[in-house]
Amino acid sequence: FVWSNQLGISTSSGADGSFELELPAASSPNGGGIADGDYIIYFFISNYELSTVEVTFASGEILNDNRIIKIDGELRKKVNLRRMVQINTSVQPSIFPKNFEEDVKVIIKATPDRSDIFFYLKGLEIPRQPTVYSGLLIKDISSGELVLSFNPDTAGTIKRVIDKPYREFDINFEIINDSLGSIIPPGTYEALPYIIIESNDNVPAHILNALESGYNEFSEEYFKYPIYRTGGKFTITE
């Protein structure tokens, strides 16, 4: 998530990290343009440390900087973000038929680079029994749409510390309903467990406020939460 609080503009980077920020066209501040001065651009991924770049505008144009930015607005160097926790999701089995009647297991493996990482997950806490984790969203790879969500009505939000060297959480779900019909048609999907990340780093409120509304809710809006994770893909066959 790329954001400038002073300019009030934002965008999301592509899969390769590239992005474009569309600046106001007018050169006059009264006309919606940019006043002379220094502006900070923030780069936010929830499981990475916040990174910033400062650029300078004069007469509505970016000033050329031999270290940071070219006059045409292209950054001279890649923006590097330092990882706080690595997140990998695996689905077992990763390929199965649409009439598969056993549980599908989703394993979240969190490997922290720091000792102050916390996850907010969904699940059921039952006295003297292991926590049952839920909060699973299934996304269709081809359309990018939500096709299935798994989270019992009685599930709540659970906070967990992510200890070194790593911590794992399991979610089990079924693709067969009570009438033995497949809930999901054949295709390729991605399992996205609901995770909101917290650390001792204070993310400025204006960044969180600038995110799409509902990013922290258990719904399709969660897809807009800036988080980098690997794995999670699985295929359902005929």
Segments from the language model and where they lie:
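Extracellular beta-sheet/turn segments enriched in Thr/Pro/Gly and aliphatic residues
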Residues: 57-94, 233-238
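A short, solvent-exposed loop/turn motif at the edges and junctions
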Residues: 32-64, 70
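Short Pro-Gly-centered beta-turn/loop motif in secreted/extracellular proteins
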Residues: 20-40, 179-186
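Short strand-edge motifs at loop-to-beta-strand transitions and within beta-strands
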Residues: 19-21, 77, 167-173
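Extracellular and select intracellular beta-sandwich modules with Ser/Thr-enriched
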Residues: 51-53, 75, 226-232
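Hydrophobic beta-strand segments
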Residues: 1-4
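Ser/Thr/Gly/Pro-rich, low-complexity flexible regions
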Residues: 90-238
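Short, acidic Ser/Thr/Gly-rich low-complexity loop/linker segments typical of extracellular
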Residues: 8-24
